[in-house]
Amino acid sequence: MLNLRTAIALCICLVLAACASSPKSTMRSARPPILSAEQSRDAAIHAMGLVGTPYRYGGNTVDGGFDCSGLIAYVYRESAGLSTPRTVAQLAGFGDAIPRDELRTGDLVVFGGGRPTHAGIYVGENRFVHAPSTGGEVRLDRLDGPYWSRQKLDVRRP
């Protein structure tokens, strides 16, 4: 009798376990592709060519001007055919997180930590290109400069 109860309990457990499991997903990850080193360099060169372009809130074209995320979207689309998110908050989760000591040309630099506020494109030698503020222009700045060195920095590699 005890064996019959054990067998019934085991069958019930197996049925419940089968009902509780979900089929393996066939969807691929939404993670963007990793750019090659050459594509990353091309993005950095393209970004440097836009230095001096006027800042414009919400802007994402050479003629209309750029804000920081519009600059990033334009550069990666034109130089590598890559679509990027259009807000700094979304850029903070885009691509792979990279330790700062592994920063390479073409990586995204995102400032603000838990609440991202600004982003740019790293171009090497501790410099990055960004569209900083209303009334300004796309410019080249240093990560170790007096202002930017005090900001929380995350690095993302698309």
Where are these regions (language model features)?
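A structural motif
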Residues: S40-H46
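Catalytic cysteine-centered active-site loop
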Residues: P33, T53-T105, L153
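Short secondary-structure boundary/capping elements
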Residues: E38-Q39, Y147
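Bacterial Sec signal peptide processing site at the extreme N-terminus
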Residues: C13-A37
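...with weaker cross-activation on analogous glycine-rich loops/strands in unrelated enzymes
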Residues: R31, L82-L143
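Sec-dependent bacterial lipoprotein signal peptides
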Residues: M1-C19
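Glycine- and charge-enriched low-complexity intrinsically disordered segments
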Residues: W148-P158
